[in-house]
């Protein structure tokens, strides 16, 4: 992502593309972005591989103005929050994905003013890729279900 300057282009992006296809959604019709605008990583395998590290709260808060500017420009009706970091960036640090995955959530008024946007939070594709096979299959099905629900929310 960092090298290509686009979100979701690696293994997690390929999983997202497959899930979108299985949900009947054309990625070309979506606005896809990252909640955190920089890539923090740890080098492994003699620097050939970069492992993403979860941003801390300060980094999430620092990037929030850019995310809000994007949302105000795009004016989405439904925002799909992929993972806890994205969800907490808009819904607050107390948000728990495990408790609210798949629910229709009201975005705070400062997110997209004068626009009744809702959100649905679901697992980040990279977290699904890290699960063992039986759990991965179930989490993938949940992701597809949540993506289908986001389409239903459009009416």
Q: Model-predicted segments: where are they?
A:
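A polyanion-binding, active-site-adjacent surface
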Residues: 1-155
């Amino acid at each position: 992502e960092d090298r290509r300057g686009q979100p979701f282009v690696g293994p997690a992006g390929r999983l997202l593309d497959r899930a979108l296809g299985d949900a009947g959604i054309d990625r070309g019709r979506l606005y896809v972005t990252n909640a955190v605008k920089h890539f923090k990583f740890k080098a492994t395998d003699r620097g050939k591989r970069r492992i993403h590290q979860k941003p801390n709260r300060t980094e999430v808060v620092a990037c929030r103005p850019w995310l809000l500017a994007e949302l105000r420009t795009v004016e989405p009706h439904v925002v799909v929050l992929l993972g806890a970091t994205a969800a907490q960036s808009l819904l607050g640090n107390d948000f728990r994905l495990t408790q609210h995955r798949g629910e229709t959530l009201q975005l705070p008024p400062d997110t997209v003013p004068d626009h009744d946007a809702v959100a649905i939070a679901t697992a980040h594709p990279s977290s699904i890729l890290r699960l063992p096979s039986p759990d991965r299959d179930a989490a993938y099905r949940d992701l597809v279900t949540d993506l289908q629900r986001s389409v239903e929310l459009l009416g």
